[in-house]
């Protein structure tokens, strides 16, 4: 049987690293097993769901390279839900309830006050129906046998259904809650594996019985540990560190996906070139049960290491017009992200603002301009210029190199000066040294 996974976001906001991680794990598991990855838009909440977020989610997944084989929307499947709901109703597996939220809350407090679990108490079949009150609907759990399923990450999961409330599946206004439509979709789409956060474990227990009530075998479940921000690394909430922010910052998708695929597992986080590489090593047996700590700085480090090894052909179409392979190979060891390239290219071929130097530093760069003007310019220009300045001024180390770097590049640090000086050319180098000496 072919593996089928699904990612089921609600179009009420943009993707953040938490649900990107869930999407990635579903994608990688399907890819590793030659299966199908489905995007299911859970848009039953008509008030909060928007077409804009629907489009943005699909655009973000496309940017990440997590392209689904199929896209379905729950808002287009209400007829299917209605038909299956009526089948369960006829079988006595869903039933009407008439309590108000206030009545339910009062009963919950009473049970807790008695030291009892706040489990919903079913009403007698002959209980009178309140007049002029519409019902909500609950799924009737089978209390006669325990709920047991094997979780690919957490191992055997066992629940006593008597300690679970019959879950509400439909509101008074006829709108759907999450649990039942999700099961109906998974049956219809032949989903074989449900991969999601550990906060859904109890949902999976109830849903296991829903699958069986519909005459279907429950899928395999994998409940992964939740993602949390590494302490002290970022003041923002995890949810704000999402696709829009990452795209704006120029993070390479594969750098983010690399980190999200490996954190919380026993595998080291090392740069990879493609999703294929991540899929090969993806295995739920490597996942731990402790919270997975996400550190944005780790993404930045992986992104930089990725930059330092990217071939020119891999980035040619994303670089400014006229960018050369020589420029790329010279500058890439200093790039943190691709967006840094244009500014460094200006150092080679554009204009910079002359730096503010001390009196002694201005005298040094004035001498450097005179030396540079007399050189036969080559790949050895930087070495020849600094050797001559050491001999004539007696300066060395930072006292010599730092003012020259500032004057020639406008930067405190950067790539090796020999390559920069050779690439920017004699005329530009002399002009910059003279400008810095006069400021």
Placement of each model-derived feature along the sequence:
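N-terminal Rossmann-like or analogous alpha/beta NTP/dinucleotide-binding catalytic cores
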Residues: 1-116, 203-216, 255
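Short, low-complexity, intrinsically disordered N-terminal peptides in bacterial proteins
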Residues: 1-3, 128, 438-439
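Short, histidine-centered active-site or binding-site loop motifs used for metal coordination
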Residues: 7-11, 41-43, 184, 188, ...
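Gly/Ser/Thr-rich beta-alpha loop segments that engage phosphate groups in nucleotides
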Residues: 15, 20, 176, 199, ...
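Hydrophobic alpha-helical segments in the ANL/AMP-binding
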Residues: 27-28, 61, 179-183, 404
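A secondary-structure boundary/capping signal
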Residues: 40-42, 74, 179, 222-223, ...
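Conserved nucleotide- and phosphate/pyrophosphate-binding catalytic cores
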Residues: 47, 51, 55, 184, ...
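Active-site cores that bind ATP or allylic diphosphates and position pyrophosphate for catalysis
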Residues: 96-223, 228-234, 242, 267
